[in-house]
Amino acid sequence: MHHALCNVIEPIVDRTFVDSCYANRIGKGTHKALDHFTALARRYRYCLHADVEKYFPSIDHAILRERIRRHIKCPNTLSLIDAILENSNEQEPAAHYFPGDDLLSPYDRRKGLPIGNLTSQLWANLYLARADHVMAQRFGGTRYLRYVDDIAVFSDSADELTDARTLLKDELALLRLNLH
């Protein structure tokens, strides 16, 4: 069922991803990401490497649903997606607070995707797509790359990478995510 669903939605959402988003994409696997990373490492003096803390367990269902609904309009497909999300892994309480939260917000929000499902991998790329666009626009699509939840930005300026980390943290906070 997950493969059939991905066959329907992947062509719709994949075209919205930046070119430097790797993993779980046709023609954009580990080797392509490593080649891109290596080329950038040889060209630039500094690299910001960032990792999203507990990425799959932290994906917020309400935010993910909103992202999915921007691209998928078929009620039957959305119903299937909702069923998959509702029946996904049990949630572990995580006391991460974000601007606007009340005391119970971290416990009231359903989170998490099972790592092995094909739908989870596609949705993980979609979840970070807006952050990818913001980072690629600010730092150039050729100096930014992401492989699942591992993010790299390259520059000849350490100060620019400090700015990149701040911008990335701000974008991730909008998704209720933290950096390691």
Q: Where are each of the predicted segments found?
A:
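Active-site beta-loop-alpha junctions of metal-dependent nucleic acid enzymes
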Residues: R25-T30
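Charged boundary/loop elements
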Residues: P11, R15-S20
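"…together with the soluble PPM/PP2C metallo-phosphatase catalytic core" -> "…together
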Residues: H2
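Conserved polymerase palm-domain catalytic core
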Residues: D19-S20, L34, A39-V148, A152-L179
